[in-house]
């Protein structure tokens, strides 16, 4: 039937179509939760026209929002729910699914990183999906760094001694330090010794870049997130933060390229004896793993710096805040250090036998993981889990860590107990699972499964060696109350402005 026969004109149809289109658009914009099964836990409030305030509430209170949602009595969100995050809408999954999805290839971490960290935009390519440096980095860390740890402990200890003398000083009077600022260069120097060898670990320009690049990177990430995706490549060309990021990468290339070219030339000239003379550092491991493939050495080095230095510094900083007002625990740790290192020296067996220290570090991670949402992924297909939970293709997911402070799992779960995992290791079947580097659905600050942090064994070694030096060489105490943890979305940081007081003491054994 012709519309005109009913007295309906084309202009009326156009106006009606526009009205319907505007209404649909308004519903999508004003009520975004209807696009997600079960709605959004932290949707916009009445009269809020955008998600800006919802994102701000998430940034300042994500831990409480997530925990409350899972604990709701109506059971509506007992398994999973959608939230507006500072990274768009994501599905928050209960930790009971961690073991099931840990090795599921339908959940892609590289796709998540590319989408979340602008991996296709110049300056952010280190997080581009399937970029060659990503696989080289993972393989080099898993196969070479972890395997070489025993030979690296002595050199790491040497760098800790040097860095503490410079940044913590030998002052025997009580004085205040900004703890995070004092820890960061110590971790950066020892890490650079392993990543770049003796040639660059004392290079002031490289040290500046390796410390600053993580901050520059995440500031640039946040700067682009305020733009619609389609405009981000253009915005990145003019953003001062993105320009600074690209400049740091170019400076890193200028520093590392001559070192790499010189090594390649030397190895070609002495190829018959190359295997016995090659340095034992990440530059060399990347070369061996690449096996002739072209890659960006500076980008690979900066990626491991972004992944390792600040997170390791954060763990050590928070650990020192946690124990600074516990002299009895500090004394027990010193006794363990003297007994263990005094007997074994810097060997892997010594680090393994620092069981109380291991417990203190794992307990610190339990109460304050670097992120309260881990195992971040994007689903590559529609997924139905074993109990029927459905996750649509293209969904950004993360697993909540709220069971790490669950009173049903841990006694006095809201309290710091440095001896907790030390005692648990004594129980049958708990010796391995209670170690810092072990992961499980009840403690997965390092992630869990196939993509658990590949550098966690190295990070554990660094923190333990540094803590041995600090506790034997310095007395420490809090300045006032313990500094609050800084929360920003799912991220949790040791307070960068928090201070402690220290003074040099005479160590009982040589380190």
Curated annotation (Swiss-Prot):
Cysteines paired by S-S bonds: none
Keyword Iron appears in the UniProt entry: yes
Known cofactor(s): heme
Record membrane topology: Single-pass membrane protein
Entry EC number(s): 1.-.-.-
Localisation per UniProt entry: Membrane
Name of the protein: Cytochrome P450 monooxygenase esdpI
Gene: esdpI
